[in-house]
Amino acid sequence: MSSIERAMERMRRAPAAGAVDVTAAQMSEPEPAPASDPAVALDLAALRELGMLTPDADQRALQEQYRLVKRQLLARAFRPAPDGGNPVNLIQITSALASEGKTFTAFNLAISVAMEVDFTVLLVDADLTRRGLTHLIGLQGRPGITELLAGEVGDVGSIVTRTDIPRLSVIPAGQGHPRSTELVASDAMRRLSREVATRYHDRLVIVDSTPLLMDSQAATLAAHVGQIVVVVEASRTAEMPLRNAIALLDPATADVGLLLNKSMARRRSSYYDDAS
């Protein structure tokens, strides 16, 4: 399976609008939680078979690669910012085209952040077309973003699923919807993005979205986030599609970076194997 050769590469250095400063008032009302629902147990063995990072395994090469990524994201995620800017702890993971490793990256990055002592992480499946993250974790059939945006459930807490990995919660995509693109473009999506990002002072929100060139959902969602990671598959992603995808993003509202996927895996693995 895929691995990461290096961490974030700055795509542009245009100033971003920044994050919303989280105040005590914003944190005074805890996010409603489904207290009666037990934490969902993730099938760690199956995830490892798919090449995913898990907290119970010795995966030193993969762990170190994601440490490089998360350090750069965390360094910006909780900085003070002017009022009205997008929350910088709200991070969108996308790509130019399908099958370049965005869901792999989103999940592994969330696991890496969950290993931190000082932060929690909310992993959100906002790819309402493929819902790959929802299937990966085994949350099919649970209400998710679709049901909340369509008004079928009443609050964010009813779609947040706790997992048995400490500090990791998930919002699934929900069921398929014929107007999923319009749901992502709705004001309800803007409110949802702001709420999950500003509710807790120590939370990183990682959002797996559709590829930028496959439909308009990803570019629409990008208007709400503070950081965007564009996953690029080594030796596969062509320059022109990547340029076209980047052109859909506004660096004035979000920090944009590239992450090179599926490259130099053997060299990094060999380094850690030799140290065993």
What are these regions (language model features)?
Residues 4, 69, 93, 125-127, ...:
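Residue-level signature of catalytic and energy-coupling elements of molecular machines
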Residues 7-14, 65, 72-80, 116, ...:
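Conserved, well-folded catalytic cores of nucleic-acid-processing
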Residues 65-128, 133-135:
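Walker A/P-loop phosphate-binding motif and the immediately C-terminal alpha-helix
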Residues 135, 167, 181-276:
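Conserved catalytic-core segment of NTP-binding enzymes
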Residues 142-150, 175-185, 236:
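Flexible beta-alpha connector loops of hexameric P-loop NTPases
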